Amino acid sequence: MLRQLRLTMDISGWIFLPWRRSMSNMKESPPPPPLASTFDDVIVDYEDPDYLPLPEYPLRPNEPLQTRKQRLLYQSRKRGMLENDLLLSTFAAKHLQSFSAEQTAQYDQLINGVSNDWDIYYWATDVKPTPKEYDTEIMGLLKEHVKNAERVSRLRQPDLNT
């Protein structure tokens, strides 16, 4: 038994010995150059090509107000990009239940009428100017919410009320 153990140790030492030698001969590589970072990076914005038509969002004229609010709450939480998920879900949790039917329709048009979620993000954070058709009372509330004057932590989406 001891003879087998000793043989195994000899073999493992022999197998890994060349590897140890090659590692000891390696020189340290110089650190990579620092990444260039500026605060005035330009946002490249391309026009949507004509050959990729985007489907129109279906209007729901006979949808009850409470059902519409529930749908908008879900859609505010499931945007597909974390930035808008956090901003819109916290905004909807704070304001959506107090919206009138007209305000709810404006919010529906804002989050479902825009084909690119990055546009909503850039408008809400005042990186790009908001187009007139989306510059509504709801967009003003969203911009105030994004400024976060209360300094509320928004690291995760709010819990759903059950």
From Swiss-Prot:
GO terms for cellular component: mitochondrial matrix; mitochondrion. Keywords: Chaperone, Mitochondrion, Transit peptide. Residues 1-23 form a transit peptide. InterPro entries: SDH, SDH_sf, SDHAF2. SUPFAM superfamilies: YgfY-like. The keyword Glycosyltransferase does not apply. Pfam families: Sdh5. It comes from the Eukaryota. Gene3D superfamilies: Flavinator of succinate dehydrogenase (1.10.150.250). It is found in: Mitochondrion matrix. Plays an essential role in the assembly of succinate dehydrogenase (SDH), an enzyme complex (also referred to as respiratory complex II) that is a component of both the tricarboxylic acid (TCA) cycle and the mitochondrial electron transport chain, and which couples the oxidation of succinate to fumarate with the reduction of ubiquinone (coenzyme Q) to ubiquinol. Required for flavinylation (covalent attachment of FAD) of the flavoprotein subunit of the SDH catalytic dimer. Interacts with the flavoprotein subunit within the SDH catalytic dimer. This is Succinate dehydrogenase assembly factor 2-A, mitochondrial. It comes from Drosophila erecta.
